[in-house]
Amino acid sequence: MSEDDILVTERLGKSFGGFAAVSDVNLKVRRGSIHALIGPNGAGKTTCFNMLTKFVAPSFGRILFNGRDITATRPADVARLGLARSFQISAIFPHLTALENVRVALQRHRGDSFDFWRSKKTLTPLNAHAMELLDQVGLADWANSVAVEISYGRKRALEIATTLALDPEMLLLDEPMAGLGLEDIDRIAALIRRVSANRTILMVEHNLQVVADLSDRITVLTRGRVLAEGDYRAVSANQQVRQAYMGVGYGYG
């Protein structure tokens, strides 16, 4: 494993009964890059992503993070190693404020149990750090807003803020643009670019314009296998990708 690669899979696969959802996926994610995992519906993206974040156990193959074999490591321990998925710790409490949600995530990162009956004064030292994280994702002005009352796009930003509370070296985002309007897509895309500084990001995303704008490298899955890999120009020019992903003649721009 090269030191330039932060995450590597070796012949990673998952079978459900007699159905091979993912087969022989060899993935290399370069340190400091934004890497996209794309493909048509049923290509195996979600299963692959779930294996990487340890929510689904691989049937075979290995997963290496920073050279360490994490194939059998528990999700919580993987997060402590610096590999975090956006929803992994960000089940947002709808009736807490944005600040309180991030503070809960910081408590988890410190190993403190969350206690609704604990005096707020004991949590005050976490407020400054929580505000810094909210500022990073553009939510400083919504710090005291109850989560249920903020827009869906800002909820997605809050999810990212709670994930950043883990101080991850690598961030995995599962369809970050899903359900967003055009204005929110632009906002979250800019946020992803901003938080990628000094971090590695792997994302599953269906919005090809976002993939084109953000990704340094793209892996295309189809029928559970890697079909192509490269930058957007190379992948979008690949005839097999056109046939499998969007159909011949689709305009990629």
Question: Predicted regions span which residues?
Answer:
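Glycine-rich phosphate-binding loops of nucleotide-dependent enzymes
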Residues: 2-253
